[in-house]
Amino acid sequence: MADKFHILVLNGPNLNMLGTREPEKYGSLTLSEIVNRLSTEATSLNVELDHFQSNAEYAIIDRIHQAKDTVDYILINPAAFTHTSVAIRDALLAVSIPFIEIHLSNVHAREPFRHHSYLSDIAAGVICGLGADGYSYALQTAVKRLSQSH
């Protein structure tokens, strides 16, 4: 592949607390450790990877808007915004960038309010319950799909 693909990784609220926050559900890796591993993998795949985490919905929306015309694919763990944010859904629709929704835990095996996602039906794919490996699987899938379409 001649040109680098540009992939944006977005992480929502409370994911900055990974490593200490309910490790039995979310694992013991910190968000920095997950992103560092993913960055190493991205380099080996000739991918430019950017990461952004925020506990603020508007900041995630602003970053999605900034991605228009510069990002080829988005990997997003919307965390609690999965179940509440029509605004993030609308932002993703507005920029028309394909994305994969990621969840560390199996949201379908948890409380009923976590079973609904405002993003899943418009996502290129959804990965849940595979822990930090889900980010790697999402990256590999995004690169494969981008390679097939370019």
Swiss-Prot record:
Its EC number is 4.2.1.10. Pathway: Metabolic intermediate biosynthesis; chorismate biosynthesis; chorismate from D-erythrose 4-phosphate and phosphoenolpyruvate: step 3/7. It catalyses: 3-dehydroquinate = 3-dehydroshikimate + H2O. The active site is at 26 (proton acceptor), 103 (proton donor). PROSITE patterns: DEHYDROQUINASE_II (PS01029). It is an enzyme of class 4 (lyase). Substrate binds at residues 77, 83, 90, 104-105, 114. Keywords: Amino-acid biosynthesis, Aromatic amino acid biosynthesis, Lyase. GO terms for molecular function: 3-dehydroquinate dehydratase activity. InterPro entries: DHquinase_II, DHquinase_II_CS, DHquinase_II_sf. The keyword Amino-acid biosynthesis applies. The record marks 21 as: Transition state stabilizer. Homododecamer. Catalyzes a trans-dehydration via an enolate intermediate. Belongs to the type-II 3-dehydroquinase family. PANTHER family: CATABOLIC 3-DEHYDROQUINASE. This is 3-dehydroquinate dehydratase. The lineage of its organism: Bacteria, Pseudomonadati, Pseudomonadota, Gammaproteobacteria, Enterobacterales.
